[in-house]
A protein has these predicted regions:
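N-terminal glutamine amidotransferase
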Residues: 1-98
Length: 98
């Protein structure tokens, strides 16, 4: 089972990355193997992912923030592929994130 949350904020307001991680934390349960977020900043997708628990994603974001006022966050329950940061959701390429 995965946890997914999306936030649409206001330009000029606070960025959504911290709120996205908090939203995943509120839905947190045992069993997921990785987590990630993807935000929209100046027309470009900004993605951060980590293997393991949400604390690992928070550590990634502390060192490499994900600016933006719109975003999605996702925890992954592995049904295929190894539990790695590369397999963590969301996946993104170009202008598309899923």
């Amino acid at each position: 089972m995965c946890g997914i949350i999306g936030i649409v904020g206001s330009a000029g307001g606070e960025t959504v990355a911290e709120r996205l991680v908090d939203g995943l934390r509120r839905m947190e349960y045992r069993g997921y193997d990785s987590a990630g977020i993807c935000t929209l900043h100046n027309g470009a997708l900004v993605r951060r992912r980590a293997e393991g628990k949400l604390a690992n994603l928070a550590a990634v974001l502390a060192g490499d923030p994900a600016p933006g006022f719109v975003g999605i966050a996702h925890t992954r329950w592995a049904t295929h592929g190894a539990p790695t940061a590369a397999n963590a959701h969301p996946h993104a390429t170009g202008e598309v994130a899923i």
